Amino acid sequence: MTSGDDAVAAAAERARQTAARNIPVFDDLPLPSDTANLREGVDLDDALLALLPLIGVWRGEGEGRDAHGDYRFGQQIIVSHDGADYLNWEARSWRLDDGGDYDRRDLRETGFWRFVNDPNDPGESQAIELLLAHSSGYIELFYGRPLNQASWELVTDALARSKSGVLVGGAKRLYGIIEGGDLAYVEERVDADGGLVPHLSARLSRFVG
């Protein structure tokens, strides 16, 4: 077999494994359960088809930069739905030590993706809203658009910080499905000088879906 054949075979095996997984749910609730596997559960709302490739559970590693310098982190992102006109989003990350092992908890955010639905402005029908609550004490609203069928760009529109929250600037994020079906992203944030600087980047492999 060639290296190309090996890669195809490996991708097929990964797909076989991830296709059989889903997120755990309680099955005694009267409403549809969340699902991160499009093969299971309720149908995806048609309004979200342009975000379909994001649905799943993603795991991997990335690089970050803060006031103390560069660091590496591990991350899991869960993107699920319950048939409504939004996607659920939960991202958790943890710092890695120099040997690549777990060091400590890091960033965590939860929120929702949806498309703008404004009858008075049909031109906004492809605008994406991403509303996030961060564990470090602030809420952030992004707006953006799909760049193509497998990439999405968003920019901070508004920030609200709690009294105990960290002081942060706005951000720009780019997500995309890349070679091998992985989810990759980069985030730049506004620094104290008012310019966008690299903050986070990661490449995550599909674990569910």
From Swiss-Prot:
The keyword Iron applies. GO terms for molecular function: heme binding; metal ion binding; peroxynitrite isomerase activity. Keywords: Heme, Iron, Isomerase, Metal-binding. Pfam families: THAP4_heme-bd (PF08768). Binds 1 heme b group per subunit, that coordinates a highly solvent-exposed Fe(III) atom. InterPro entries: Calycin (IPR012674), Nb(III)_bact/plant (IPR022939), Nitrobindin (IPR045165), THAP4-like_heme-bd (IPR014878). Its cofactor is heme b. Pathway: Nitrogen metabolism. Heme b binds at residues 172, 199. Gene3D superfamilies: 2.40.128.20. It catalyses: peroxynitrite = nitrate. A motif (GXWXGXG) lies at residues 56-62. Its EC number is 5.99.-.-. PANTHER family: PEROXYNITRITE ISOMERASE THAP4, THAP4 PROTEIN. Heme-binding protein able to scavenge peroxynitrite and to protect free L-tyrosine against peroxynitrite-mediated nitration, by acting as a peroxynitrite isomerase that converts peroxynitrite to nitrate. Therefore, this protein likely plays a role in peroxynitrite sensing and in the detoxification of reactive nitrogen and oxygen species (RNS and ROS, respectively). Is able to bind nitric oxide (NO) in vitro, but may act as a sensor of peroxynitrite levels in vivo. Homodimer. Forms a 10-stranded antiparallel beta-barrel structure able to accommodate a hydrophobic ligand in its interior. In fact, this fold hosts the heme group, which is located in a wide surface cleft. Belongs to the nitrobindin family. This is Peroxynitrite isomerase 2. It comes from Mycolicibacterium gilvum (strain PYR-GCK). The lineage of its organism: Bacteria, Bacillati, Actinomycetota, Actinomycetes, Mycobacteriales.
